[in-house]
Amino acid sequence: MSAGVTLPLFVLPMVLLPGEIQQLRIFEPRYRQMLDDCLLDGKSFGLVCDDNEETFNGWNGPKSFGCEAEIIHHETMGSNHFVEIIGTRKFKIKEVIEPALPPFSDQSMEELMPEVGIYPDLDTILEKIPEDKEYHKLYLAADVDFIEEENEISEVQLEELTSALKSVIKSIGNNINVDQEILDEWVDSRIEMIIKKDEDTLYSIAAMTISGLEQKYEILSKSDSDEIYDEIMTNLTKIV
């Protein structure tokens, strides 16, 4: 693992994989503050699947493994922020830094929510932070170690992945009534977009074919390419 750093955390019922592109809508004050900090400093954040079994100052905590997210596009529409992100490096959390304030559902925060669903402005919220707090952010952060990995796969594994993926994509093509005369060409064009001989090939396949949180998290938490390959093949076999 590489030297540890501190990352802001976006905690969601979601798993991001390296090389995967996702869109997020940001409207909560804590994440609007986080987005401002990231955009101002040109920094990334960590996207981590939430863990309902552990809380930090009333907020759901993160699972142990996450993925660094780089912001590649941002736009604002009213009070909502829309960002496009790409997963970069996997990391393991060493220590969570709890947010300065609890959720609005906490009794101490009730005065800030006169109407359900209407958030107060950020300055008003920040005034509630106790002076003795060392950490003055509304969002969780964590000290993390980035996971160094070389996801090299053999030619045999690549061929097996390609064959299994072709079967899945061909099944999709049949289900959406792609013309049989161009079906093979349609399948091959999609294979070319997904399978590349680089370190993100395994994650590209996983991002396209695996939607279950538990399955994606299993892949995120593994550092051995053979284990990741086996997990993907198991899921591809189930789809076919």
What role is predicted for each listed range?
Residues 1-240:
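N-terminal low-complexity, acidic/polar interaction/targeting segments
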